Swiss-Prot record:
Protein name (Swiss-Prot/TrEMBL): Cytochrome b
Family: Belongs to the cytochrome b family.
Binding site for a ubiquinone: 201
Lineage: Eukaryota, Metazoa, Chordata, Craniata, Vertebrata
Gene3D superfamilies: Cytochrome Bc1 Complex, Chain C
Keywords: Electron transport, Heme, Iron, Membrane, Metal-binding, Mitochondrion, Mitochondrion inner membrane, Respiratory chain, Transmembrane, Transmembrane helix, Transport, Ubiquinone
The species this protein was found in: Acinonyx jubatus
Length: 379
């Protein structure tokens, strides 16, 4: 008699993906973030569903409906803060996951990598629209500023912005459609994540050494199931501490003021996880140039495989590239800090230098270091 998990059409898929999956024996904790992202996605969908039961997407009542959730709904405050801070955890895991892919050369799985970029862009769009929904000052002005960037597109820009707004300014139509998209996009993300996994399991996971491990694989369960549960417990601990002790740590105080189109906040800025891209946008004085730099700061990930010059896959045995990678991480942290600062000296100059360093590291320095390391191998 055959085992049901190996013969049943549906359970068989789960078995091949999470139980009997052949996995390299040497993958480190950096490979935990994929499963953590799956957990974050499920958490966001569940908390979001309960929030949507009480939220109203109308400009007159949106702000008070969020207040009502926090004050009057049973455990509404914890659901709201788990959703808001869950997004921060989601992005921490997402950036770690992308960083691991860059460090260990996982971008050589081109289909998996490209679907990952699509996932990143979709999650960013979803998070942006979610930030607009509470209809506080930063929600309103953030939506106005970011959507207005599309007006930089020649010829069709202004019409495109008004089409997205559903009028001549950010108003009821904008809020309603943002809520509709914010509700549907996580399910599209789930479908993309399934395709991401499908392509990954076609090739098998990469590993720290970057060389094939087909001859020496172990089953995912129980070895990596236990390892992933440790990462999951750490994630839950961090999220719980954040939600219960300082739920507003990563938020903006201006968002506790109801949206007022007649009063602009002194510093308009997005959530912390978009600040690096916002800093790159602000560092270019020209509007169209800034928008292009903003787009390219994310889309540059798609051309990383083309600029891979090293004979080795990962950076485990490439000290020059390792130095450049950590320089890039420090640069992104600097950009994140600059994005939250006012537009004045010396922050403008620091932002411009950090933006130049970001693009030059990825497009010039890393390919050159790969060539130098290839030469060093011949010595």
């Amino acid at each position: 008699m055959t085992n049901i998990r190996k013969s049943h059409p549906l359970i068989k898929i789960v078995n091949h993906s999470f139980i009997d999956l052949p996995t390299p024996p040497n993958i480190s904790a950096w490979w935990n973030f994929g499963s953590l992202l799956g957990v974050c996605l499920v958490l966001q969908i569940l908390t979001g569903l309960f929030l949507a039961m009480h939220y109203t997407s109308d400009t007159m009542t949106a702000f008070s409906s969020v207040t009502h959730i926090c004050r009057d709904v049973n455990y509404g405050w914890i659901i709201r803060y788990m959703h808001a801070n869950g997004a921060s955890m989601f992005f921490i895991c997402l950036y770690m996951h992308v960083g691991r892919g860059m460090y260990y050369g996982s971008y050589t799985f081109s289909e998996t990598w490209n679907i990952g970029i699509m996932l990143l862009l979709t999650v960013m769009a979803t998070a942006f629209m979610g930030y607009v929904l509470p209809w506080g000052q930063m929600s309103f002005w953030g939506a106005t500023v970011i959507t207005n960037l599309l007006s930089a597109i020649p010829y069709i820009g202004t019409n495109l912005v008004e089409w997205i707004w559903g009028g001549f300014s950010v108003d009821k139509a904008t809020l309603t459609r943002f809520f509709a998209f914010h509700f549907i996009l996580p399910f599209i993300i789930s479908a993309l994540a399934a395709v991401h996994l499908l392509f990954l399991h076609e090739t098998g996971s990469n590993n720290p050494s970057g060389i094939t491990s087909d001859s020496d694989k172990i089953p995912f369960h129980p070895y990596y199931m236990i390892k992933d549960i440790l990462g999951l417990l750490m994630l839950i601990l961090m999220l719980t501490l954040l939600v219960l002790f300082s739920p507003d740590l990563l938020g903006d105080p201006d968002n506790y003021i109801p949206a007022n189109p007649l009063n602009t906040p002194p510093h308009i800025k997005p959530e912390w996880y978009f600040l690096f891209a916002y800093a790159i946008l602000r560092s270019i004085p020209n509007k169209l140039g800034g928008v292009l730099a903003l787009m390219f700061s994310i889309l540059i990930l798609a051309i990383i495989p083309i600029f891979h010059t090293s004979k080795q896959r990962g950076m485990m045995f490439r000290p020059l590239s390792q130095c450049l990678f950590w320089l890039l991480v420090a640069d992104l942290l600097t950009l994140t800090w600059i994005g939250g600062q006012p537009v004045e000296h010396p922050f403008i100059t620091i932002g411009q230098l950090a933006s130049i360093l970001y693009f030059s590291t990825l497009l010039v320095l890393m390919p050159i270091s790969g060539i130098i390391e290839n030469r060093l191998l011949k010595w």
